[in-house]
Amino acid sequence: MILLDTNLISEAMKPEPAPAIRTWLDEQAAETLYLSSVTIAELMFGIGALAKGKRKDKLTAALDGVLEMFADRILSFDVSAARRYAELAVRPRAAGKGFPTPDGYITAIAASHDLAVASRDTNAFTAAGLDVIDPWTAAD
């Protein structure tokens, strides 16, 4: 099972997504793919911040389609994820490093559900010891 990061969903929502993303998504069994509530918040914020117009309307419609498609596969930042976030964030802090947010929250959700993560930005996820798939390079 795979948690899709915000950058992957954002790319898939474009009018012309990268061919590698389209191919990778087409090859996955839909029931194995999940979103996080954090990704939904990031997408809603990004769309909400746009000026009124066709682009905003198209992205709003695309997000509505994503929400419908993933209705039963959206994972929340719950108490289990909060515990994992705290565990994961303490280690880098002790080493004098930061732990990113919101990627840290997405990492914690994936870790609490034992999911791999599909993302272009792999650093936070690999640092947490998660299995990471980069669909932009998966075919390479």
Role assignments for model-derived ranges:
Residues 107-140:
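Acidic, PIN/NYN-like endoribonuclease modules and their adjacent C-terminal/linker elements
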Residues 45-54, 72-120:
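Active-site neighborhoods of divalent-metal-dependent phosphate/nucleic-acid chemistry enzymes
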Residues 1-35, 39, 48-65, 139-140:
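Short, well-structured N-terminal submotif of metal-dependent ribonuclease cores
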Residues 4, 17, 97, 101-102, ...:
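A generic structural signal for residues located within well-ordered alpha-helices
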Residues 11-12, 24, 46, 85-88, ...:
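Residues that scaffold the ATP/ADP-binding catalytic core of kinase and kinase-like folds
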